[in-house]
Amino acid sequence: RSKIAANVSIDFIATTGDNFYMKGVQNLEDPLWENTFENIYALPNIKNIPWHVSLGNHDHMGNLYAQIDYAKEHPNWILPNTYYSKVFKINENADLRILFLDTSPFIEEYRSTPDYYPNLMKQDRQAQVQWLDNTLSDSNSTWNIAIGHHPVYSAGAHGDSEELKDILPEL
């Protein structure tokens, strides 16, 4: 992996969530920060690459706000909110807007087990849908791409996310 990383020019890394197994991080002092992120991605050619982070269901098992707080102290961990967007300039004629979504609050299986997902019920799903609608409507970007933990459509083992097909039909 280090040989590959040494020969590739990377502008940023985008995650699709489940940043920390099995139950997310608990706080800023959680050893998972060091053991599974800081020490793993410490190679000279990748340690300063920005990480644009999405949240997954395993992140909701922990303190997802610790990941937001971590971003305030570590500028390469970018997570200003549970969902957000960022515009990347491709060239003088094109740009790309990536919408980083928090899809876990839309999955009914998780909402029906709040003991496993303590922060999930605090998330305002309608506010995220409204934000998404407004952001896409107002976007002048050449391309808009949404990234989230759960795919709307998938040929993978978990299949489609039916809740997302109903709630986020424009995706």
Positions of PLM-derived features:
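Extended active-site neighborhood of metal-dependent phosphoesterases/phosphodiesterases
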Residues: 21-143, 158-170
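Active-site clefts of carbohydrate-active enzymes
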Residues: 150-155
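Glycine-rich phosphate-binding loop signature in dinucleotide/nucleotide-binding domains
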Residues: 4-8, 138-141
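Active-site beta-strand/loop signature of hydrolases that rely on acidic residues for catalysis
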Residues: 1, 9-24, 56, 145, ...
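Short, well-ordered alpha-helices that flank and scaffold nucleotide-derived cofactor binding pockets
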Residues: 2-3, 39
